[in-house]
Structures are given as C-alpha cells and as structure tokens.
Amino acid sequence: MFNQALHLAVGLRFAAVAVLALGAGAVTADADYDLVINHGRVIDPESQLDAMRSLGIRQGKIVAISETPLRADRSIDASGLVVSPGFINLHSHSMAESGYRLELLDGVTTVLELEAGAFPIARHGRRLGEGPLTHFGASVGHAWIRMQVIDPEAIAEVARSGRIDMSGRAFTQPANQEEIDRIKMIMERELAGGGLGIGLLLDYMTRAVNDPERDMIFSMAARFGVPVFVHVRRGIDGDPAGLEEVLAVAERSGASLHICHLNASAMSGVDDWLDKIDAARARGVDVTTEMFPWTSGSAAISSDVFSRNWREIFAIDYGDVQWAETGEWLTEATFNTYRIERPDGQTMHHYIREDWNRRAISRPHVMVASDAMPLANYERKVVPNGAGTSTRVLGQYVREERLLTLSDAIARLSLLPAQRMEAFASAFRDKGRIQVGADADLVLFDAARVAARASYESPFLAPAGMEYVLVGGTVSVRDGALSDEAGAGIKLINSLGDD
C-alpha cells in the first residue's frame, strides 16, 4: 500500500513540475483542479518556504504550487491570510463530535489520543459516524487493557456510561506475572491491529505499575518500533525522578519515548527537565515532548495523585481547585464529598505558571498539544484547551510576545508532530507540509487577528482569525464557522504491516 502511495506522490510531483515549467498560462488553461487557493502567504516549515503562492488541489492532495494565480471552478481568495499545514494534535481526549468540532475550528485537522490511548483499536472512532470532522487515531491504551484484565467490571462500566473511577483496582493494584502476560498478549494484538504506539498513564497508576510491567511495555514498543506516550509519575514541584525513570528505561530498551504535557509535569523544573531530555537525545535516545499553553491541569477527582500529598505536589490548596462541569470553586468539604459521590468527575486544578509555559515553548523541538478533555456535549464545562490551543500559541506567543517566529510555531503544531509519527505510520509523511504530493490538510488564518477566545469561564468560544480549514481537500471551516461540507476525516492507523 505504501509503495503505491509513494509512486502516486512521485507522479504528482513530476506532473506539477512539468505544468509549472510551462508558465502560468498553461496552468490556468490546462490543469483540472477541484479547488485552488490564490494569493496566500504560504508557509511550509520543512522547506522553509514563506512566500506568496497559489495552491492547486485535486483528490485531497496538493498537486500544484504556483507563483501566479491558478484557476478552477472553486477557489479561495487567501489575500491577507497565512496558508499553513493543518495542525496535528498528538494529545487530545476529545472522543466525540462536539470535541472534534472545537478542535477543527482551532485549526486542528488531525486529532490523536496518544497519552491514554484507546481499546479496542478497531472500535475507536465509531461514535464519530461516517463523516468524522477531522482525521483521528489512537495509541494502544495500556490502562484500558489493564482494566480489562484486572477489573473487567470497571471497563464494562466505562463502556456502559463513559464514567471512569480511577480509584479502582486497575489503577491501584500491582499485576502478578500471569496478569502481565495477559496484558502483553492483548497489547500485541492491538498493535498488530493498527494502534499508533502505546499510551501509558504511569502517574495515574503510580502504586500499580511495577518494574516488570513497565519494562514489558517498553520492550514491546522497541520490538514493534513504536513510541511509548507517557504521563510520567509525578513528584513534588520540579522533581525529575519520573522523567529520569522513563528516560533510563527507554535508553536501556531502545524504545522511542514521548513525554506528554512537559510543562504540567515538570512545573518549575521545565529547564532542568528539558536539559535532561536534550542530553538523552545527544546520547541517541529517541525522545520528544510537548506542552499546552494553559495554566490549569485537569484530572478525575478519583485520580491517584489526589490520594497522595497533592497540595504539596502542586503547591496549591483546596481553594485552587474547580469542579470542571460547573466552575464551582471547592472547599475541603466539597472536595471530599465529590471524591465519594462523583469519582468520575473532572477537576480543574490551577497550578501551572505562565512563566513555565514560556520557558517550555522557547526551547527548540517542544511541540504543542492541547490535552483537551472528553466532551460529549456543551452542557458541562471542561478546560478551554480544545477550543483554543493552536490559536493561543499563534496569538500570544507569536504575535503578542514574540517568543516564536510564525514558521517555528507552525512547525511545532504540524511538522514536528508529523515527524514524530511517520516512522511507524506512513500516512504522516504527507502531513504537516505544504509540498506537491502532500495531503491538502490546510489552515488559513489572519496572523494579525488570530487569537483564542475561549477561557475557563467560557470554554467553548471559537477563536478569532481562523478563517478556513481544509481536511483532505474539503473546506470544513469557512469564514470561521463549520461548513456544510465538513466530514472528510479518516481513521489513521500504523503501517507496520505494509512493508
């Protein structure tokens, strides 16, 4: 399959080069495009192209890049707009159309659930129906497989109600060797079924996952050639022990590693953590990381960390925690009541400092991901990450604070995530780029106006300045609103069996 796609891409590249060599007149008269985008400032972070160009799109692919306008029955005038590769979100818990809608309006064309993952992979995305708003995919969710093996009634309850009690046996009880072997068998089957790596929620299972189980996971990842996407075990502010643990296991096993939401885990130690990651990369460890540009964490109130010394860990108190769905600020009494009566409920614990975020995003190769929370409807509030992560970076860190160049920010939102995935999922070789033969996953935004409008008080507000979003060549957002055409997303799986 990959070889056929490669031949097609090469053919498209040569065809477009031949057409462009004839001059603008030949392109406008002879080329048959489904859609053209004219007069835009095209930024491709891989080739470093940053210039006025026009794009020709056919069958979901970019087939022409021209210095002069192109002509077709359908066109977009991108005057005054930046044309960028569609954004790839490696870390989102959006599991339903309502969440995907928010991310699409924020410029995300590929939504991936890689930290927690999914199980079974074959059923991931079925709730999205036949026309998903964005491309999507998931890693193999170790936690859910662990629940299947150790506490099957709990996973059945998740399937019935969607509610997860993280104080149950699967999140607190170490596995014996027989259980580890069963977890391994199911995980291998799920990787063979297309899982995009392995999702490992170590911090949520601090007491549960012992060294043999952890080492089994990393050894499997190395054998299959996929990364482990890990939420590291958490210590007090800045403690690097959780990072050092997974770096050592990755180096010993040869597994690829991705550290989720570094700013939220490292806290004031972001520089030290990134120095350790850079040192590991220099030794040959394949390790990457990400951050989100918000200042609150979000977790189920039954999470293991809230059974530990969480006030010392986060350096906050009960009054810094909100009940996510209503925005209620908690007291010790209401916190403990919710722990008993609503163990599935989400909190927003406000402990992240803007300074940590700025220090993280200023370092090379740190990607951006939303860590958006599950959202079945708009009746219950969640953190605003899903509605305003990409646009917050573009508005705040690029335009207002000038911490990043526009091209650098676009790379962290598109190219770098594609490069993290493409070694084991070949579909990503055509994403995160504006090049002939690349997928026509594109965003068009006004760099002078783009900004997140969502907030903790109003988490569902669509951003400003995000004018068009194309998914597979389909105009899915037009003039900042969902279009009638939206629904061109496809499921993405690994390509381990294609070679």
Residue ranges, per PLM feature:
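Conserved beta-strand scaffold positions in the cores of enzyme catalytic domains, especially
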Residues: 36, 75-77, 87, 136-138, ...
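Active-site neighborhoods of metal-dependent hydrolases
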Residues: 148-209, 247-251, 256-406
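Conserved short loop/turn motifs at secondary-structure junctions
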Residues: 91, 202-207, 232-237, 261-267, ...
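Flexible loop/turn segments at secondary-structure boundaries
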Residues: 95-96, 119-121, 144-148, 205-209, ...
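Divalent metal-dependent hydrolysis catalytic cores, especially in the metallo-beta-lactamase
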Residues: 101-122, 133-144, 191-206, 224-233, ...
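Active-site microenvironment of metallo-dependent hydrolases
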Residues: 6, 10, 16-20, 25-53, ...
